[in-house]
Each structure stands twice: as structure tokens, then as C-alpha cells.
Amino acid sequence: MRVKGSDVSDGATVRLLEIYERLLAHHGDRRWWPADTAEEVIIGAILVQNVAWKNVERAIAQLRARGWLTLAALHEAPTEDIEESIVSTLYYRMKARKLKTFAAMVEAEFGGDVNLLLALSAAELRARLLAVWGIGPETADDIVLYAAHQPSFVVDSYTRRIFFRLGVTREQATYDELRDFFMRHLPSDVGLYNQYHALIDALGHSLCLSRRPRCGECPLQSLCPSYARPLLPSGVSHCGAGSPS
């Protein structure tokens, strides 16, 4: 989506929207999240923790083949069989427990109806998700945004790397500080948050790499103080960065 008619008087807002428009022009519509149902989004959000999406796709295919792409099915399925189906996602034993725990919560508190959970307000839903074992801030925000279709900006390692190199945020900023920064300076729009997060991940995966970033191909090079400046061996930029405010 393109942002029209937004209040862009704030300097940080202007910069964030310019970054967004450049990423959109370069990468196009990402059409993310690739799932058919809200439950599939939730399952994928848990499985993708600390692993590449291609690994999750294999696990999703295995779960689909067994008819286990619903929380009700996972609630009834043997843990060992779930583990066998999701082995491609790494940490598969822990992730099987996380899936079972989440499914049990929906069954116990919402009568097995995930739509009742997702109907909570964004703030209530996020708080309830964070109270579930195995659900951290990024996974919670994935579920709020992509399953419940409510505004909650998702932050990941790509977000941290890219916006530190751009001089927009501090390297040591916490997850909540980064999330609050984006939500304070961007219009509260589900489509915008959805697309922006997907575009950030596209850039981080293809060009703004942790080591040897491909700066010469980056659509943000003219905005980036790290462009054409050497990186430390760790891949961290030499440039300074401002605080999220």
C-alpha cells in the first residue's frame, strides 16, 4: 500500500515514510503473511522463531498433510507426532510444546474458538499472548498484526540492523523501544504495518546483510550514513545513531 493523506509534519514520520516508499518501489508488494487462515498464521508465527521461513514451509506442509493446521487438531495430536512433523524448524521439541500450550489456552479460556481470542482489542490481545508460555514480543505482534488484523508493529533482527545503520535508532534500543518508536511516528494502519515489516525483511534478507552488505544495490543508500563506509569485522556500522524518540 501507498500512504496518502497522512500527517507527515513530524521529521521522524517523514523519514520513515520515505524509507517505506523507497522499499516498496524496489521490492514491490510482498503479500505477506503466506497463510490461508488465522490459525495457520499463529502456528507459523510460533514455528518461525529462530529459523528461516523455508524451514517453516516444510513443517506447515507436513502438518497440513496430517490435518493438523488447526489449534483443535494440535490440541488432540500426540506431542511426539507433532515433533516429527516440525523437525525442520529446529528446536522442534520445544516448539511442539509451545503449540500444545497455545492450543490448550484457546481451548480452556475461549472454548476452542480462536476468533474470540482474536476479537480482543490489540492491547488486550497482546497482553494475553505475552502471558502464554513460549510467546515473546515478536511472536505476539505477528499474531496481533497478521492473524487478528490489528495494528501492532513487528520488530525483528532485520529492523534493528537496518534502522541502526540508517542512523534512525540506537543499537542498544530494546524491543519495546523500537516498536513504540515506529508506532508513535507512523499512521496506525494495519496495511502499512503489514507491508513495512515485510519490506524490511526483504531488504535485510537480500541486501542489508549482517556481513558484507550489498550497499551498492540498496534503494536506501542516499539516506544511509553507513553507505560507502567500512564496517567492523562484526558487520556493525561505524556510524553513530540517534535515539528513538
Q: Residues of each region from the PLM?
A:
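Acidic, metal-coordinating catalytic segment for phosphate/diphosphate chemistry
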Residues: S245
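Phosphate- and other anionic-substrate recognition elements at nucleic-acid/protein interfaces
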Residues: M1
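Catalytic cores of DNA base-excision repair glycosylases
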Residues: K4, G11-H238
